Amino acid sequence: TKMKKILLQTEVTKMLADTFTPVGIYLRLRDRFRDTILLESTDSHAAENSYSFIGVNAIGGIEISSLNEIEFKYPKQEPQKELIQKVQDAPDRIWAYMQQFEMQPSTQKEAIFAQGLYGYATYDAIPFFDTIEFKPGASVIPLMRYRLYQYVIAFNHFKDELYICEN
């Protein structure tokens, strides 16, 4: 059965960032909102790609804690767990998940900052993408974890601007 697309519309507010730091805002938000993350830029002097991001309040996502199970999270729904038959199928399942979201076009190019998944894949997630096999072991963190956030705060360090993007 084909699932109905989940429509997302992103609103963007631009502010001067000269009195804010990504770490300062993150520290104020992390205990108030679940799943808050900070991805900080290392180069604040380069004009391109000099951004830091704070994701606040996950509304969807994917989590893989073992080589045989994947969990999908959708806005306002209970998480859904599914078995992974072959580890090489996981990237296609992640792609299929992402295709279930339809982003409404925005007049502000910065809306794209909130219209994707933020997360990570650990070293132990290599079997999902290659033929390498590892000895099974207990992982203390998920092998892969990606989230769609209700709010993404994007800092443009080069221009001293911040964008509050809301889905």
Name every feature range the model reports, one short phrase each.
Residues 2-167:
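Signature of the chorismate-utilizing enzyme
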